[in-house]
Amino acid sequence: MSSERQLAGRIVVPGEPLPEEVEASPPYVIDYKGVKRATVVGLLREKGDGGGRAFVKLKEIYVPQAGDVVIGLIQSVGIMNWFVDINSPYVAVLSVQDFLGRPFNPAVDDMQSLLKVGDYIKAKVVAFDKTRSPLLTVQGEGLGRIVRGKIVEISPAKVPRVIGRKMSMLKTLEEKTECKIFVARNGRIHLECPNEDLEAIAVMAIKIIDEEAYTSGLTKRIIKFIEEERRIREV
């Protein structure tokens, strides 16, 4: 591996002590008898602002939190609600009343015509406390059924890297591919691109970020990759 692609930090294994300046962030970093310890495999890296070191988990499952905007996949249809895959161990619920924004009338409203299995939605997590299914809403600007574009799935742990500091990586992706990109907290990304070639380039670039998220020089490699692909495809 070249120095350009070396990990920008040190691998930490579960149970390993961490420096005192690392913030405890359960369940990934715990304070056990006065010593900070990792509970998952992660990376110990220098903070960009020179403020010491931080622990970054390398693998993560998505645990919903109220206020998160997620991209969900309709998994099944109930009597008065839909069950939604949100890329998490927890299956979410969206009520038909919420989707319609009014009371449901079974004599008039056909749930299958509103949302069917396999449809994607952009929704907000309203409530979740691990004792019941996450509750979703599509009432809000930009929320609802996704009717066009492509969905890409990455590790939820890599979401901050796709967005970048001050949205730098996301802006780079949008400027270089001419795609409109929305990154949901649960590791799903919605792309709306001018054509199939630019969409394919954007998907490949995002996959590179997902695979090489914590390597140095990534932004420059992404720019070079996109520019080269556009040259080859003449787009």
From Swiss-Prot:
GO terms of biological process kind: CUT catabolic process; exonucleolytic trimming to generate mature 3'-end of 5.8S rRNA from tricistronic rRNA transcript (SSU-rRNA, 5.8S rRNA, LSU-rRNA); poly(A)-dependent snoRNA 3'-end processing; RNA catabolic process; U4 snRNA 3'-end processing
GO molecular function: poly(A) binding
Residues in KH domain copies: 149-205
Ranges for domain S1 motif: 67-139
Keywords from the UniProt entry: Cytoplasm, Exosome, RNA-binding
Subcellular location: Cytoplasm
Matching InterPro entries: Exosome_RNA_bind1/RRP40/RRP4, KH_dom, KH_dom_type_1, KH_dom_type_1_sf, NA-bd_OB-fold, Rrp4, RRP4_S1, S1_domain
One term under GO cellular component: exosome (RNase complex)
Family matches, as PROSITE patterns: S1
A Pfam family the protein falls into: RRP4_S1
Main localization category: cytoplasm
NCBIfam families: PRK04163.1-1 (NF003181)
Main function: Non-catalytic component of the exosome, which is a complex involved in RNA degradation. Increases the RNA binding and the efficiency of RNA degradation. Confers strong poly(A) specificity to the exosome.
Family annotation (HAMAP family): Exosome_Rrp4
Similarity comment text for this entry: Belongs to the RRP4 family.
Subunit structure: Component of the archaeal exosome complex. Forms a trimer of Rrp4 and/or Csl4 subunits. The trimer associates with a hexameric ring-like arrangement composed of 3 Rrp41-Rrp42 heterodimers.
Protein name as it appears in the record: Exosome complex component Rrp4
Lineage of the species this protein comes from: Archaea, Thermoproteota, Thermoprotei, Desulfurococcales, Desulfurococcaceae
